[in-house]
Every structure is written in structure tokens, then in C-alpha cells.
């Protein structure tokens, strides 16, 4: 999967150009994918919309519906239909992914407040 934050690093990669500043760039270049050299993304993608949160990696997806107190955890390789919630069976993994999601959200909030610029 890819997201809009992958556009800039991909365009820079296609043009073999460097960023014009030291500001952090979200996303990743998809040039290796286009060249056939990338089978897995390797870094999770975060989503937040209308109270819903998701942290989606190559294998696991952590998800919380708006208003829900608990996250659900799915193994996208073994359970692509997302029918088996593994959050209780794998609490350490769920906690680690929730921490990564929280760090991503904090980074987004810092960017929105102009702290990266």
C-alpha cells in the first residue's frame, strides 16, 4: 500500500533530486517498487479519520473504531479478511504497535503546528 505522503519522496527519487531543506519528509520513495525491487513496504502506514485509527504494517494491522476503548489487532497474512482479533492473544505486540501509532500521531500534530518548519 501507499499513501499521499509517498508522492514527494517518490518524485524526488524519480528525478534523482535531493530535498531543498533539512525538514523531515514523511512517506517513502516508491521507486524501488516501480523498479520491481520492493516486495514489502517495510514501514507501517498510519491513518486517522473521524475518530478511527489504524496502524498498518506488512503483516499486522492495529485498528480502533471511533469511540471504541480497545484496539483490535489483525494478522493480515494469516487472516486477510480481518475476522480474528488477536489483541488479547498478543498483548505485547498490540501495545508496541499502539506506541508506534501514538508516536506517529504526535509527529503529525507537531507538523500541523509548524514545528517541523
Listing of model-derived features with the role each one plays in the protein:
Residues 3-76, 107-114:
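C-terminal cap/loop subdomain of S1 sulfatases and analogous C-terminal strand-loop tails that border
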Residues 10, 82-85:
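A general alpha-helix detector
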Residues 55, 94-97:
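Hydrophobic packing residues in well-ordered alpha-helices of helical domains and bundles
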Residues 79:
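Intrinsically disordered, low-complexity polar regions and short flexible loop motifs
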Residues 84-92:
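Active-site-proximal N-terminal segment of extracellular/periplasmic enzymes that hydrolyze or transfer
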Residues 96-117:
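Charge-dense polyanion-binding interfaces
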Amino acid at each position: 500500500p501507499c499513501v499521499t505522503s509517498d508522492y514527494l519522496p517518490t518524485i524526488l527519487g524519480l528525478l534523482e533530486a535531493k530535498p531543498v531543506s533539512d525538514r523531515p519528509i514523511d512517506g517513502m520513495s516508491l521507486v524501488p517498487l516501480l523498479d520491481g525491487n520492493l516486495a514489502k513496504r517495510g514501514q507501517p502506514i498510519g491513518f486517522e479519520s473521524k475518530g478511527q485509527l489504524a496502524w498498518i504494517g506488512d503483516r499486522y494491522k492495529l485498528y480502533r473504531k471511533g469511540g471504541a476503548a480497545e484496539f483490535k489487532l489483525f494478522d493480515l497474512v494469516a487472516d486477510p479478511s480481518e475476522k480474528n482479533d488477536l489483541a488479547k492473544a498478543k498483548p505485547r505486540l498490540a501495545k508496541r504497535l499502539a506506541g508506534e501509532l501514538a508516536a506517529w500521531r504526535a509527529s503529525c500534530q507537531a507538523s500541523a503546528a509548524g514545528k517541523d518548519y
